[in-house]
Amino acid sequence: MNAIPTRKIAALLGLLACSTLVGINPAHASSHMDAPLITLDPAANTTDVYAFVAVNPAGQKVLEVALGVYPFEEPGVGPNKYNFDDNVLYQIIVATGADVAAGNDSITYQFQFTTGYKTQGTILQSYVGVVNADGDSSQNLTQTYTVTKVVGGTSTLLGTGIVPPNNQGVATPHYNVGENGNNPAKPGVTDPTQLDVYTLGAIENLSNGYRSWAGQREDGFYGDVNAIFDLLNLRTGSTNSFDSQSGYNVHMISLEIPVAELGGDQQVVGVYATTSRQQMAVLSSGAGSPAPALTGGWVQVARQGNPLFNEVLVAIKDKDLYGRTKPSSDAALFQQYASTPELASLVNTITFSGMNVAPTTNRTDLVGIFIPDMLRVDLSTGPARLAAGGSNFPAYPDDAGFSNQSVFGGDTLHSAIQAGFGGGAVAGGWPNGRRFGDDVISIAITAVISDLRTNPLTIRSAANIDNVSGNDAVYNKVFPYAGTPFNGRNYLHNPGLGLEPILNFAARGLAGNNAAPLIGGFIVQGDKPVQVLVRATGPSLANYGVTNPIAGTTLSIYSGMTQIATNSGWQSTQKAAIQATGLAPLSPNEAAILITVSPGAYTALVGGSNGASGNALVETFVVTPTP
């Protein structure tokens, strides 16, 4: 089918002929296991690279870039947590001007980390108490970092930063709904002042208008990589969606670069990232367990540009070589894999039952996309449209006009330097850079099964081909954009696989006039509404031996900052319906609300009726999950 009008497709063909322009650069997001050797080195293992145009709080146009490392972080694992490696050199590289087509480095931004402990005379490695601010006395293990700009042989220190704690749970309550370590992680926000204190406190203002952030984030990539590499046997059905990265965290390095620092916005730039280690590490035995002695120059061990290229196009024998080389060598070493992609043959054999749908030879269109392997970003456009909750969390809407299919979903931006698809229209997301939320798997497969050499182009849509329509968390619409890391005490992997959209949830504490409201939070996952019962128990707690129970409760439910329901006596409004659930409160002085809610994050606030104070319990139950 033609996903773009023929007139625009004909114009698009011209873009593909010039590697310095923004063409159809579809790519499959990395499953984070791109090459054999780097899978053995998770702290240096690059996961994804993001790059897009934005405007900073001062109103200046900036290029947002981000590098993910350390794949498949299980939330809450300890006592030795996931951290950046002091012995890894993390680099984000930007190519400008003629360097884009040549694959050369123009500007390199280096991040180097240092780890320290407030005390090593304890088994409590990361936290010795509840952390209320980055680097406080309870954050035992604390990492700091430097940011250095390198141009040619000249290095300039831009500044330093601190890494916030990982989201453990009770030890890091402010990451989570209601500032409660037992609750799920907070959803993304649209205003910087709404960021949790750890994330906000770790945003570093560097020299010359740069900003940086480094720390743990939820893995913003989504897709069924398991099925793709299970001989392309893709899952189908509304209850059979499997997100390979669901419930996992990564470590993210984010840098906000003023466009003026790159030579202005009338250009297309290239972006990629690398990790490196020193040549020699010598291990020692004996007392004191000294750290390895490191010597020699830095050796690149991984790189990331268009994630699809190494993982899906490059043969096993060359995958490690790719990680050790620069984009400037791609034409000589790896062009064959774009020109004659094995993936196209596999798709024809397995997915299309032997029909020659995807072109398999002379793929000059793919060569133009991936050689050299860098993200390309048109800096002349306005800010990219941003994702928030996508289809899984409609209560947190994406920007108007955002499509996770990018240009294939009609999401375009206006370029001042390219004709694009006509009138200066260029892709709104991947392949014009890459935003959080872009469905790069679908875009990638669309490109592979299409023919971008014909005029007009032959476009065959692969939207939602892996049966995963969006992320399992809400992105931030403000720096550093990636979502809040999952809570080690409250998270799920793939809740859509026959599991309830939320788990029954409870929290107990003081409430009423002499205390702050008792706050409970819950997140509805999936893509369909569910009916829940939220109840605020007070006087009946005495039946279970709870001392000082509150005499009466009030209950309010919020979606974001908006109150969507309130009650101060469950028998006053929904008595019959609540009784029918079998979950009615035992006392008429207790509040309860039966409500149908869409996927998203919600907060329940419990107060005291008629001036009462005391212990209360707030609970959320799934009543009728939609099949």
Protein language model regions, located:
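C-terminal segment of classical bacterial N-terminal signal peptides
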Residues: C18-A27
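Phosphate/pyrophosphate-recognition segments in soluble nucleotide-handling domains
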Residues: L12-G14, P495-L499
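A sequence-level detector for low-complexity, Ser/Thr- and acidic-rich stretches
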Residues: L497-P627
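Generic marker of residues within folded, mature protein domains
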Residues: S19, D41, Y82-F84, Q245, ...
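Bacterial N-terminal signal peptides that target proteins for export
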Residues: N2-L13
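Surface-exposed extracytoplasmic segments
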Residues: A27-G496
